Amino acid sequence: MKKFIFDVDGTLTPSRKQMDVGFSAEFLIFCCKYDTYLVTGSDRAKTVEQVGLDIYNRCKRVFNCSGSDIYDGHNSVYRSNWKPSDELISFLNDELDYSNFPIRTGNHIEHRPGGINFSILGRGEGNMNCLLYTSPSPRD
């Protein structure tokens, strides 16, 4: 049987958004015909929110948190127990303090199985601010 591996954000769904309803129905049929795997940086809850529980459970295996939290349907088959050191968290907080970027939306250090997600901007409200943060600033 053919096997297919898909990224979620920006491939099956718009980044951090839910899958289109029409596409979702077609993709579920696809998952019934082929061994389908998902790979994402998001945790299980966010992935289910994006693709829906039917698709999530129909996939042969889902590699959440970049492979640090792996599921076969409802069954967890692997979860990394790595935790960041206090020194690393302190360093990231220092980087946040030293940044000149003026906008902060909260949730700057997000703990996930096997890793952390760090953002100067933060993971709080306001996706539009991402464009401001990633746009190159004019040089003097």
Where in this protein do the model-derived segments appear?
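Hydrophobic beta-strand segments of well-ordered beta-sheets in folded domains
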Residues: 2-4, 35-37, 116
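Short loop/turn segments at strand-loop or loop-helix junctions that form parts
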Residues: 6-9, 65-67, 112-113, 118-123
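Ser/Thr-glycine-rich phosphate-binding loops at phosphate-binding pockets of nucleotides
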Residues: 11-12, 39-41, 134
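Conserved small/polar residues in nucleotide/adenosyl-binding loops
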Residues: 133-140
